[in-house]
Amino acid sequence: MAADVGKVIEISAASSKGFEDAIQAGLKKVSKTVRHIKGAWINDMSVVTSDDGKVTEWRVNMKVTFLIG
């Protein structure tokens, strides 16, 4: 019986709408070249602000797991 083998890649994504949108955008982009995505782990979240303190961009770094072979 063959065991499933996974691979993990790390990606970064950003959005002007929020963290959830940044996650969705990152997964959508990576799914164009990677098949069999099984999950993602968000390991860092940050924001960019304007001079007056308003959030202008939400950023995430995530590890995406997918099956190979």
Where in the sequence are the language-model features?
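Short, well-ordered alpha-helical segments
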Residues: 4-38
